[in-house]
């Protein structure tokens, strides 16, 4: 079945052809009696016809776009198809003469609201799925954090036991004294070694 848009396009072409047919070259030449008939008047006539046809088609395209007629024609086709389907399956016809304009408009917009509702439901399902994935990721990160904390606590406990064992054996004090002896060499190695050498020389004398 031909769509409403195709029918409207065909109507435009037919109307343009009929209009142009009423402007033949002979009648056009009569508007310029001072000009001789020939190629010049024929070229002017052809250019005028082409300009007229192009302007009409451009205006038609602008009108279709500004009023969104393609979408509205598709909606009309859909409404007619639904009505024919209901009639074919024995559903009673709706007498719109007894309906208020608000009811007619509501019925007209029902299908579009239904499409919008379906889209919103799909978006909601997508969001739920995304949230589920994020929850799984967060749970995994929490588990990894807990494992890391547990390992750190275990290491701290081992360190505390090691320090406690060193204190019992008096190793901690020895390590502390040794570190204090080495600290000057670490902080200022050049001057420390010089002083040490001078002291050694004095002892030998």
Curated annotation (Swiss-Prot):
UniProtKB keywords: Cell cycle, Cell division, Centromere, Chromosome, Kinetochore, Meiosis, Mitosis, Nucleus
GO biological process annotation, one example: chromosome segregation
Q: Which domain of life is it from?
A: Eukaryota
Give any Gene Ontology cellular component.
Answer: nucleus
Q: Where is the signal peptide?
A: none
Q: Where in the cell is it found?
A: Nucleus; Chromosome, Centromere, Kinetochore
Q: Pfam families, per this entry? A: Nnf1 (PF03980)
Q: Any idea what job this protein has?
A: Part of the Mis12c/MINDc subcomplex in the outer kinetochore which has a role in kinetochore function during late meiotic prophase and throughout the mitotic cell cycle.
Assembly description? Component of the Mis12c/MINDc subcomplex in the outer kinetochore. The KMN (Knl1c-Mis12c-Ndc80c) protein network forms the outer layer of kinetochores. The KMN network is composed of three subcomplexes: Knl1c (spc7 and sos7), Mis12c/MINDc (mis12, nnf1, mis13, and mis14), and Ndc80c (ndc80, nuf2, spc24, and spc25). The mis12-nnf1 protein dimer directly binds to the centromere histone cnp3.
For this entry, the protein name equals Kinetochore protein nnf1
**Species name:** Schizosaccharomyces pombe (strain 972 / ATCC 24843)
């Amino acid at each position: 079945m031909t769509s409403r848009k195709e029918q409207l396009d065909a109507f435009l072409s037919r109307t343009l052809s009929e209009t142009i047919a009423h402007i033949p070259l002979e009648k056009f030449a009569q508007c310029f009696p001072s000009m001789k008939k020939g190629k010049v008047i024929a070229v002017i006539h052809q250019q005028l016809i082409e300009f007229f046809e192009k302007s009409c088609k451009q205006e038609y395209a602008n009108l279709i776009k500004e009023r969104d007629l393609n979408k509205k024609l598709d909606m009309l086709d859909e409404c007619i198809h639904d009505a024919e389907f209901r009639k074919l399956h024995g559903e009673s016809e709706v007498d719109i003469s007894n309906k208020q304009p608000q009811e007619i408009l509501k019925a007209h917009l029902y299908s579009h609201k239904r499409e919008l509702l379906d889209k919103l439901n799909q978006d909601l399902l997508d969001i739920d799925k995304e949230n589920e994935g994020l929850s799984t990721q967060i749970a995994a990160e929490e588990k990894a954090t807990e494992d890391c904390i547990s390992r750190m606590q275990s290491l701290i406990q081992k360190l505390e036991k090691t320090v406690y064992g060193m204190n019992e054996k008096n190793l901690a004090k020895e390590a502390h004294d040794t570190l204090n002896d080495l600290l000057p060499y670490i902080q200022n190695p050049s001057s420390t070694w010089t002083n040490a050498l001078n002291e050694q020389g004095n002892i030998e004398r």
